[in-house]
Amino acid sequence: MAAARPSLGRVLPGSSILFLCDMQEKFRHNIAYFPQIVSVAARMLRVARLLEVPVMLTEQYPQGLGPTVPELGAEGLRPLAKTCFSMVPALRQELDSRPQLRSVLLCGIEAQACILNTTLDLLDQGLQVHVVVDACSSRSQVDRLVALARMRQSGAFLSTSEGLILQLVGDAAHPQFKEIQKLIKEPAPDSGLLGLFQGQNSLLH
């Protein structure tokens, strides 16, 4: 069987990694839909653990912005501190150690800052980026919308958490499917995305 074309954006557990970006205490009351974003990212993390997809976690200037919020469920992950508005410099060694890596699944904040710059850095390295749109946000919905449009223009894939989860598991016969089915039985919480995609002037058309 011919290999999948990179432009298709297929996601497979053996060639993917989940990035969790800067979901920290000081952002809790400033980021639009923060509880919903963290809830979806936590769902992605649980699926990654079930399917043995590696996970990397960063914190932006934790001395000032605090630790990762506990509801993410990131116990056992070692957060990497950074000041750069991209995850890539902090994760360079991890990326270089995974020659089979093809796809990065990206969750976190803020869309117009660390998510955008991480996306551009990863695309520049020839990796596919799948922005989990219901697990990324900003303080401003305008910044969120424009950042999503910008990442799409640059070649990133915009995906929902459930779409990516079902791509990763691939088959209802998968031994972990019943556990994953429990996680997606309820739809992901509303994080204000529908309004961003509607209207004649939507940047995402």
From Swiss-Prot:
InterPro entries registered for this protein in UniProt: Isochorismatase-like_dom, Isochorismatase-like_sf, Isochorismatase_domain
Positions where Phosphoserine occurs in the chain: 7, 202
Pfam family, one: Isochorismatase
The organism's place on the tree of life at top rank: Eukaryota
Regions that span the bilayer: none
Main location: cytoplasm
Keywords assigned by UniProt, alphabetized: Cytoplasm, Nucleus, Phosphoprotein
Gene Ontology, cellular component aspect: cytoplasm; nucleus
Location in the cell: Cytoplasm; Nucleus
Gene3D superfamilies referenced in this protein's UniProt entry, alphabetically: Isochorismatase-like (3.40.50.850)
Oligomer status and interactors: Interacts with CDKN2A.
Family (UniProt): Belongs to the isochorismatase family.
Full protein name: Isochorismatase domain-containing protein 2
Organism: Pongo abelii (Sumatran orangutan)
Biological classification of the source: Eukaryota, Metazoa, Chordata, Craniata, Vertebrata
Gene field: ISOC2
